[in-house]
Amino acid sequence: MQKLGIFIYSLGSGGAERVVATLLPILSLKFEVHLILMNDKISYEIPECQIHFLECSKPSENPILKFLKLPFLALKYKKLCRNLGIDTEFVFLNRPNYIALMARMFGNKTRLVINECTTPSVMYMKNNFNSLVNKFLISLLYPKADLILPNSKGNLEDLVQNFSISPKKCEILYNAIDLENIGQKALEDIALKDKFILSVGRLDKGKNHALLIRAYARLKTDLKLVILGEGVLKDELLALIKELNLEEKVLLLGFDNNPYKYMAKCEFFAFASVFEGFSNVLIESLACSCAVVCTDHKSGARELFGDDEFGLLVEVDNENSMFQGLKTMLEDDKLRKAYKNKAKTRAKAFDKVKIARDALKYLLG
């Protein structure tokens, strides 16, 4: 049995982390899997496999220190792969990607497959140290991979057009979801008895919850707005809710490891994100038969929903456009029902069995 090294920063909460946890049970049937982490947080149930820690760092580590440590971690990673006899590396997230690619420069000969789950030119659009370093490292290192697996067409196009990556080195591997598990968890009860609109995501600027709240405030509706997630903007959003006199209508319920029970019971799902790689939450909302109002963000929104075929797209960072989208979904019962009826059909394209089959094809070369 071939040895597969899956290298990711941690298995804490996050989209790439959830994809790894979803694929692990199937990949473990075909490979002897070695999970290589840089942080000991594991938030998901995973099958029995060998776990190795390259280091135990903190996400809040100084960015300059992170950069300076890369070559030393690459040498350590090269030695670990050699000692374990790894045949193929499957690497997720930027920092592990850089380390594995530097290890390739230092002589690591194993087959190297990396995942790209963001749109780098959007993710690193600011003119600061972090963005400049990341763009430089992507341009320098990514061409050294044997195969790059962006999780959307938009992310693939970004690598080709903005980082001069050869399209011959790239194949799309969409995010995997566990439809059966989602369906089971969606059956759980919730304490909330009122009808509601739902949004799920970290409380940060990228998710743009403030715009969603302001757009919702203009609706004439008895529906609550429920937001699941934690983040640095919680106090700021609570202040906005108070300013708009919405304390009884907008509910910040924090993180819930089972958002599906809310998705299955909401009137519709609203998502105001400024950018995404390819959002797990949106796929999961479709798996729960949600009608969706979503910003036409880069990348993946239009790829997932089509031209309003599976969800209603609105302009990014445009309060009036979001308001009109919410209003349309609220008032057009026929449209809302039509989206609900075909949502799960769209979600089936991302079921773990299909995506794992694609992953195995790429990993086995």
Swiss-Prot record:
First-tier enzyme category under EC: transferase
One term of GO molecular function: hexosyltransferase activity
Annotated CDD domains: GT4_GT28_WabH-like (cd03811)
Membrane-related topology note: Peripheral membrane protein
Pathway recorded for this protein: Protein modification; protein glycosylation
SUPFAM superfamilies, per the entry: UDP-Glycosyltransferase/glycogen phosphorylase
Keywords: Cell inner membrane, Cell membrane, Glycosyltransferase, Membrane, Transferase
GO BP annotations listed: lipopolysaccharide biosynthetic process; protein N-linked glycosylation via asparagine
Subcellular location: Cell inner membrane
Entry's EC annotation: 2.4.1.291
Family matches, as PANTHER family: GLYCOSYLTRANSFERASE WBBK-RELATED
Family: Belongs to the glycosyltransferase group 1 family.
Extra information: N-linked protein glycosylation in C.jejuni consists in the transfer of a heptasaccharide (GalNAc-alpha1,4-GalNAc-alpha1,4-(Glcbeta1,3)-GalNAc-alpha1,4-GalNAc-alpha1,4-GalNAc-alpha1,3-bacillosamine) from a membrane-anchored undecaprenylpyrophosphate (Und-PP)-linked donor to the Asn side chain of proteins at the Asn-X-Ser/Thr motif.
Role this protein plays: Adds a GalNAc residue on to the Und-PP-Bac2,4diNAc-GalNAc disaccharide in the N-linked protein glycosylation pathway. Transfers the third sugar in the heptasaccharide biosynthesis.
Name of this protein: N-acetylgalactosamine-N,N'-diacetylbacillosaminyl-diphospho-undecaprenol 4-alpha-N-acetylgalactosaminyltransferase
Species: Campylobacter jejuni subsp. jejuni serotype O:2 (strain ATCC 700819 / NCTC 11168)
Gene transcribed to yield this protein: pglJ
